[in-house]
Swiss-Prot record:
Cofactor stoichiometry and binding remark: Binds 1 zinc ion.
Protein name (Swiss-Prot/TrEMBL): Protein SprT
Main location: cytoplasm
BP terms from Gene Ontology: response to stress
Active site: 70
SMART domains for the chain: SprT (SM00731)
Listed GO CC annotations: cytoplasm
Ranges of residues in domain SprT-like: 14-156
Keyword Cell division on entry: no
A Pfam cross-reference name: SprT-like
Subcellular location: Cytoplasm
InterPro entries (UniProt xref): SprT-like_domain (IPR006640), Uncharacterised_SprT (IPR023483)
PROSITE patterns: ZINC_PROTEASE
Length: 164
């Protein structure tokens, strides 16, 4: 997986060097990115971070659009300095002129939400399900008490969990 992506990063740098007739310092490439972001360019560290899950699910578009998008940030920073806007005209120039791609700010990849476990707590009131997060459930196990707002009785773990 990283070989194709690293190769694409190198190709993007070679394109920029041909276009601008100068060399650029190569970045470190990391696959330590999770969540909704497909990629992040850390300008001062000369580091590119990519989301391996989104890459796996959208490899073709990722290589075509996301990699040049992030490389363009580093190229723009090396050419124009740190006072430019992240998706400003300098970055757009690189996207259009060097990579011949639309300067899209955001990806449209489907991002799966992480499933979350809820711990069901109850009190004597009818229909009294209280779904607790893992953090709140942990607090109860450490001795914290939560009371029902209606009956003022302590909420007790039912032994049930629910995945959302």
């Amino acid at each position: 997986m990283p070989d194709q992506l690293n190769s694409r990063v190198e190709t993007c740098y070679q394109q920029a060097e041909t276009f601008f007739k100068r060399t650029f310092k190569r970045p470190m490439v990391s696959f330590q990115l999770r969540g909704q972001k497909a990629g992040v360019a850390h300008l001062h560290e000369n580091l590119l971070r990519f989301n391996p899950q989104l890459y796996k699910e959208n490899a073709e578009d990722f290589l075509r659009q996301t990699v040049p998008h992030e490389v363009a940030h580093l190229i723009a920073h090396q050419l124009f300095g740190g006072s430019i806007q992240p998706h400003g005209e300098e970055w757009q120039l690189i996207m259009r002129g060097v990579y011949e791609l639309p300067p899209n700010r955001c990806h449209t990849y489907a991002v799966k939400r992480r499933s979350v476990i809820r711990y069901i707590y109850r009190c004597p009131c009818p229909d009294s399900d209280f779904p607790f997060t893992a953090q709140r459930h942990s607090m109860v196990r450490k001795g914290r008490r939560y009371l029902c707002r209606r009956c003022r009785e302590p909420l007790v773990f039912s032994g049930e969990t629910r995945t959302e």
